[in-house]
Amino acid sequence: MPKKYIFPSELSWLSFNDCVLQEAADKTNPLYERIKFLAIHSSNLDEFYRVKISDLHSIPEKSNLFEKVNKEINRQQNTFGSIWKKQIIPELQENKIIYYENQSLLPLHTEEIDSYFKTTILSYIQIVYLSEDENQEYFLNNRQLYLLIRLKNTNGEITYCYINIPADKLNRYKLLSPVKGKNYIISIDTIIKKCLHYIFPDQKTSTAFAIKLNRDENYLIEDEASGNLVSKIKKKLQERKSGSSTRFLYDFNMPEVMRKLCKNAFHLKDYEMIEGGTHHNFFDLFKFPNPNFPDLQNENFPPLKYFPFETKKSIFEVIGEENQLLHFPYQSYHYVLQFFNEAAIHKDVTEIKVTLYRISSQSLIANALISAAKNGKKVTVFVEVKARFDENNNLFWANEMQRAGIRIIYSMPNLKVHAKVALLTLKNAGKTKNYAYLSTGNFNENTAETYTDFGFFTSQKEYTDDLKQVFRFFKTKEKNYPISNLWVAGFNLKENILQHIDIEIQNVENGKKGAVFMKINGLNDKEIISKLIEANNAKVEITLIVRGICTLLPGINGYTENIKIYRIVDRYLEHSRIYRFHNDGAEKIYLSSADMLSRNLNRRIEVAFPIKDKKNHAGD
């Protein structure tokens, strides 16, 4: 029997996506920001089908949960469609932006789309005819958009085929010429539908319906410890392209005969066939064109300059004097880039060590590391090639860095390195000094513009000595190194969190105040949940801000009545992790890369670091 204070993780995740949908419906948000929230919702749901749904229908005891999940997804999809059709499109029209769907085109726009189709779109079109032979094999690419087409020739003969919509090659939405003060936008889906007569000139009629297939992109390497792990990952990445289907999305207008045809041709199960709208992949709305209406978007907030880094020529001079804490994107991420760029050319820098989990495709940091190696610095980079959906990008940069002479340490068996840390060694006049950067977020200058994270620079030995031990572990795989100041998953992180909650419990039992605050992205670890319930029953004040999955339900008498749980969904993606313990008034604050998820605490290397400077502590 499930515990009444536990909420299924799949439904919790969907509740987060529902919050995103609420932002899309919130008219206090600018119109194009609401369109962006629809794109986020669509992207999130697409990932849900790629990595989470397969387990539900493969485990018999989860069949009831599978039904609840489908019911919630259907509810959200109906809400999504209503927001798009009844709110967004009419409000676009109010702002003189016409989105073409089923309406007739103006003559000028007919000429434009004909030209664009013939010169550009048509070069990508591939036709696959469907036969009645059940032994014939057909393959739909994962997440690719297609049109399933019913053709009828002059003799009344009917054939079926499907063609690709090249949204992976071209912008999904095209801005057409303005007419009489109005702007016009059309999707390439609609352009193709209106130009089918160019593809099938001998057919009397043609009717097209949107289809799309999601495939399971979870992969499991049975034995990570033996053989070459990187080679195994590369093989799995190839296999992922042809993973089993998890969702076949089709236009709700599609006739039953065509649905049956799809089921047979693509070997689909009933539960995989899901009714959708006339268009799929709404995450392409990220690039929905804005003709020139800045007031329909959020006002631009340029990041603040950080004065201490502006007053000295060398960033190391500033860090050497005092610890420095930055909050992104409110403060500029350029200082992180400056840290690595200056290290690459600084005459005193002899060695650089860094962990890379998710880096940008055009990474300035990776390029700085390459320059450092070519400038004679000793550079060691731990590259996590098991970072989901970033495996290929990480492998690419690992190869580029290796070619430049950088020592690359790859993923470890049965363990992910999720820590975001760097350690630099400087030597001058016979003296050696280390500088460290620790962060809650990835070394990624692109996501740093939209994710809230903290970055901490220090040269204090209590931090740098512990980081030396962490990097030594990456090299030797041994854990017999003392780590005292940092909390490191796999070493002492979980134990320290449990111990500090125990201290708050003890303080309350001694008549003092006890309080725990955590801002995290997920909570499902059973030991942490049990300890929070114990603290709840001891009357410890517990406040949690959990962006994503949270399997703990607040307000359950006898378990969580003293626990407050909030979720923040807003302009920026909340990504930072903060642990705060009242500690009888001498509060302790840790920033971390780790959520309170079992995978973070038990199967990853994470680093939490204390913020001891009172100037960086917010008031109650």
Which stretches of residues belong to each language-model region?
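N-terminal localization/anchoring segments of enzymes in phospholipid and broader phosphate metabolism
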Residues: 1-514, 534-538, 550-620
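Glycine/threonine-rich ATP-lid/beta-loop region of ATP-binding domains
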Residues: 526-529, 533
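Hydrophobic alpha/beta core scaffold segments
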Residues: 541-545
